[in-house]
């Protein structure tokens, strides 16, 4: 298999959608990877799943679905890294008996415990009462590593964000100093031009 960049590891090379709990990275017998949605669409038109790159056949026993193919562990290791986000997704159960994943801010003042009732604003200025539902770690989709590793990765990510913010501030200050210096040179030259007919030279 050819070497892929990390960005291409994050997306299905057929539909170019990012892998997610709905679009799981499935490993074919030929060791190529594509999302479960694309494989399901291929399976509806064919009896077996044929790799779009090498044409290798991945046979599924009768009654088996694409979801029972193994996930690609290399891709899962890449996409399990938390991405920069100000909110942590929390599963909530709405009164309409649907289950949604909404980003709820985590703060001590506004935190909801499992089973607590609360009210959250949804798009379109709608208010819905919600009940927080916790999902055991072993049932959460696409979670990799132990909770301690996740905490360490989050701390590393925050360190990178703080570092990049600080370097951005330093860059702005440096550019401002250079501009002030150049403005001083221009003003000095302008004052010398206005005095060129005097005996005093600007040096």
From Swiss-Prot:
The lineage of its organism: Eukaryota, Metazoa, Chordata, Craniata, Vertebrata. It is an enzyme of class 2 (transferase). Keywords: Apoptosis, Lysosome, Membrane, Metal-binding, Transferase, Transmembrane, Transmembrane helix, Ubl conjugation, Ubl conjugation pathway, Zinc, Zinc-finger. It is a single-pass membrane protein. The chain crosses the membrane at residues 167-187. It is found in: Lysosome membrane. Ubiquitinated. Autoubiquitinated in vitro, leading to its degradation by the proteasome. Its main location: membrane. Pathway: Protein modification; protein ubiquitination. It catalyses: S-ubiquitinyl-[E2 ubiquitin-conjugating enzyme]-L-cysteine + [acceptor protein]-L-lysine = [E2 ubiquitin-conjugating enzyme]-L-cysteine + N(6)-ubiquitinyl-[acceptor protein]-L-lysine. Residues 106-165 are annotated as: Necessary for interaction with RRAGA. InterPro entries: RING_RNF152, RNF152_C, Znf_RING, Znf_RING/FYVE/PHD. It comes from Homo sapiens (Human). Its EC number is 2.3.2.27. This is E3 ubiquitin-protein ligase RNF152. Interacts with RRAGA (inactive GDP-bound form); stimulated by amino acid starvation. Interacts with SEC16A. Belongs to the RNF152 family. GO terms for cellular component: lysosomal membrane; lysosome; organelle membrane.
